[in-house]
From Swiss-Prot:
This is Ribulose bisphosphate carboxylase large chain. The keyword Plastid applies. It comes from the Eukaryota. The active site is at residues 175, 294.
Amino acid sequence: MSPQTETKSSVGFKAGVKDYKLTYYTPEYETLDTDILAAFRVTPQPGVPPEEAGAAVAAESSTGTWTTVWTDGLTSLDRYKGRCYHIEPVAGEENQYICYVAYPLDLFEEGSVTNMFTSIVGNVFGFKALRALRLEDLRVPVAYIKTFQGPPHGIQVERDKLNKYGRPLLGCTIKPKLGLSAKNYGRAVYECLRGGLDFTKDDENVNSQPFMRWRDRFLFCAEAIYKAQAETGEIKGHYLNATAGTCEEMIKRAVFARELGVPIVMHDYITGGFTANTSLAHYCRDNGLLLHIHRAMHAVIDRQKNHGMHFRVLAKALRLSGGDHIHAGTVVGKLEGEREITLGFVDLLRDDFTEKDRSRGIYFTQSWVSTPGVLPVASGGIHVWHMPALTEIFGDDSVLQFGGGTLGHPWGNAPGAVANRVALEACVQARNEGRDLAREGNTIIREACKWSPELAAACEVWKEIKFEFQAMDTI
């Protein structure tokens, strides 16, 4: 063992401050299969060498502090410390580096996303030696993954519950998001489900406000679901938002949803917190409820390119914590999402195994072993003209969610749902016949308009609506 990294009591205690790189920068280290690996985008302060910056990240997110302490001699830091084992410059950026850090598995509590994040993205992000710091990706070892339950049910179980195969699922967020009474809200849910949608959704803002208390909303939405099911012969659902001010209240709402016999509830997992989310996911698995996850507040954390945490890390954390759906951007709608980056974390949500692919922002090969997959939800500023692109980009295992693109139909909610269902069925049929959705998408939609006046009206309303802004988050 190098004297530079010797930290046992035999060395003796020497008070003072020493460079982090003497202990925590170990380029000779060979990572273990049980290590949690992190890729940080590090922007050091002027005059701080990248080796010192990377070592500081490893130290402050594991066993280190700003000065030598005598209690270092009471343990083996070489067993427990994080190690910065590789540094590479970021192409096209001045004084910015990707620093790779390995963490021993014993640093983390089993089955706790909360504890994992408290260590890896805790105080280190306020460290003065760094101008900016962003966690780009994590490699979660199989040994740690197996301590988590993961999604309550997963993609295949959900399809079996709904008896729906071979196409994306269709949803709609009820608008206006705030202000409707429970009865009028339930009416909108019924009209959308009757028109052909598989799901409707509470907006993330909807909890239990004075204009619509949660219990009233749950009752009217359950009535809407059962009425639509009886009339269409299809299984329907509404994402009843169980997010609340306390975990106890959240579980109480989930219990009431189960008593009503509805298939799915919802949680805002970032604002609600990972501890609450994991608790709700466990309840949902034990009681046969699907769990829809909204990512409200994610852009506060992930939108800045140089500081924060990339959404692919939040997506991996959600797959560990538990959720059957999660919002994942659209590529083509009103919300941020560059195509290759979005498809990278969509695959991380759905697939059992993903290879390292830096062109899609994937820094590590990741195995999920037996952890169920999560359905990505495309939502935000999408309408019928986007249907071919969405079908081609996201494939069958996805939820395509049209809020304004359903409720904004000139003829009303049910015709809006009809238009979306017809557009989806036309795109799926065309794809199955071997047609190129990317090249022939508009033609396919126009052909379907000939036998669907609802779709024709929707196409006329949204024919010139585009959201063309450059993505902030690029490779």
